[in-house]
Amino acid sequence: TKFATIRLGYHGDTWNAMSVCDPITGMHKIFSGALTAQIFTHSPKIPFGGVWDDSDLAELRDTLRKRRDEIAALILEPIVQGAGAMRFYHPEFLKGARKICDECGILLICDEIATGFGRTGKMFACEHAGIAPDIMCVGKAITGGYLSFAAVLASREGEAGVFMHGPTFMANPLACAAANASLDICVRDGYLKRVLQIEKILKAELESAKEIGGVEDVRVLGAIGVVEMRESVDVEKIQEMFVGRGVWIRPFGRLVYLMPPIVISDEDLRKLSSVLVSVLKEISKNV
């Protein structure tokens, strides 16, 4: 059996995870001849906040129905396609994917490594669509970024058939302590309100980037702000400009984006945003 997934996705740099990353944008072309060939369908076309049209699910529905006997699971990033595209897609696509998986007897895996624990304004991005996956992958913010730690969550039905495996570094006590402390903060009153405040500031501060020549799109969801350029940026040059102005921002390809820590101050967030906009204005004048 194989995994099905959508294009423009990114799921990490370990061997099998690379096989479900987009073969073009996933940064793993060097391994393309050796990775397992998985089943890809188009990425969602309708953006978050757009007018929904069920035709956006047509290819996924057709593929899963026709190839259900060879598909073990559908894996995707819910709502936000991260390092592969920094795109925000319509929640109805995820809701429809859940329904199709149920119809075809296929497990749904949601990769919440980047989106989990409030990043999109909901505790988990799946909540935007009102669905629960059979398996959920979480990491990054589970420890607040202090220690490497990840977890795989499963429904009772999904867990029932799993062969138990105990990796060497499983349940590291120090990482578990950091995760418990981070989760205590996540469930406090005001945590998600802070994410929405970050969203409000990002929308206001990045608005002027829409007027910069060479900018294709500006989009914000929760504590994620993205400026998409029409052409790839000179990463070395633009990073030098950012550092020279006292901030660290990592652009890639045509994307310059912010995913600040939730504890960032309003002042620091405004500085990050204003430097991003000023640098893009400067480089656009020299093109």
Feature locations, PLM:
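Conserved N-terminal phosphate-binding loop of PLP-dependent enzymes in the Aspartate aminotransferase
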Residues: 1-287
